[in-house]
């Protein structure tokens, strides 16, 4: 089943996004004055209508079709190792620069005062 994250489809995330945006808009409109404050009711009713439409008219069937055996292929195998080699070289270069500029920094003796 394509498009599933954490065992739920895209519709659940769409509904969550709609309600988060509606609640944010309601909070912002509650600070308004005049007739704009009463538009909260229309925003809430609009989100309620969209939610009922999405719940009552689903796109997919309730029972998914059985899938065939899936063969897992790593198409980015070489690229992943090139990226790993590059990041390892950058890490070792940064470690070398840290060693030369910070840990091996010379400490000069302060001159003694002569009387």
Curated annotation (Swiss-Prot):
Q: How does it sit in the membrane?
A: Multi-pass membrane protein
Transmembrane annotation, as ranges:
5-25, 38-58, 81-101
Q: Is the keyword Transmembrane helix assigned to this protein? A: yes
Annotated localization: Membrane; Cell projection, Cilium
User: What is annotated about its quaternary structure and interactions?
Assistant: Interacts with TMEM67.
| Purpose | May be involved in ciliary biogenesis or function.
Q: Which family does it belong to?
A: Belongs to the TMEM218 family.
Quote the PANTHER family the UniProt record gives: TRANSMEMBRANE PROTEIN 218
Q: What is this protein called?
A: Transmembrane protein 218
The organism named in the record is Mus musculus
């Amino acid at each position: 089943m394509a498009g599933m994250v954490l065992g739920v489809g895209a519709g659940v995330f769409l509904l969550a996004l709609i309600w988060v945006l509606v609640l944010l808009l309601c909070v912002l409109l509650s600070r308004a004055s005049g007739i704009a404050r009463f538009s909260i009711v229309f925003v809430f009713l609009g989100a309620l209508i969209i939610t009922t439409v999405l719940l009552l008219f689903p796109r997919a069937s309730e029972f998914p079709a059985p899938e065939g055996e899936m063969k897992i292929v790593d198409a980015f195998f070489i690229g992943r190792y090139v990226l790993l080699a590059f990041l390892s070289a950058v890490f070792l270069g940064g470690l070398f620069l840290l060693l030369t500029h910070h840990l091996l920094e010379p400490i000069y003796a302060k001159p003694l005062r002569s009387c």
